[in-house]
Amino acid sequence: MIDSNTSLVLGEGKCRYAFFPGCFLCENEPEIVVKAYDSLRFQKTDTALVILHCGDIEDVETAWDKLGQPEMILCCPRCAEFFGRELPHIPVVSLYDKLMEYGISGGCNSVDYCLHETSGGAGAGDAFAEGAGAVAELAESMGATLHPHEENSPFPYLVNDIAVRNRLKSSNHDAAHILELVYGMGASNTHLIHEHDHEHNHEHEDNCGTGSGCAGQPEPPQPLPDENRRRANLEELVQVLQMLY
């Protein structure tokens, strides 16, 4: 869990947006956090980054005020629910909507998935009610075939919640997070048809339509991090971000 030793607020002056990745993504997939923030800043340079626990209401409000009260870009349904319930005055938008708006997507992916989305509950407001459609659009824009949710699906589950991905994988179900597809990295690479730099969509304007360069063997899946590894991930993530930005 993010605490005072692993918290970070990056941004100067009045920012239009602030990316709030949340504990689960930072602990489990720190490289995706870096990639996501980089792709957001590439589109809008006045995008800040806030690595705080969403439950630290006072710290979140202080950071939000310091950055000029930006719109918060969320990728975690649990964070969205908390913001909607405890911080309803802070404007939020889902990361998946912003990725679609900016035209950011990953490379070719012809895998079949069972869509398993988390809405975040009643407190999440519109951020993830609207963002749910963007998850499907992102996957389909990469060539994935989506199937309705069902128990014990023969296809790997595609989720928008890292905690749900971990729970499914721990129960011996195949599962991947949508950001693993977009950025071509993560603990579920066994389902990625090819691996190449998905950093910015402008570098892949043809979206691999010819299939050239998209062949290859998927990498074996990485094990889910244990508690010590998750803590180390947080500490290393903060260090890397401070060096980069």
What are these regions (language model features)?
Residues 1-245:
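Iron-sulfur cluster-binding electron-transfer modules in prokaryotic oxidoreductases
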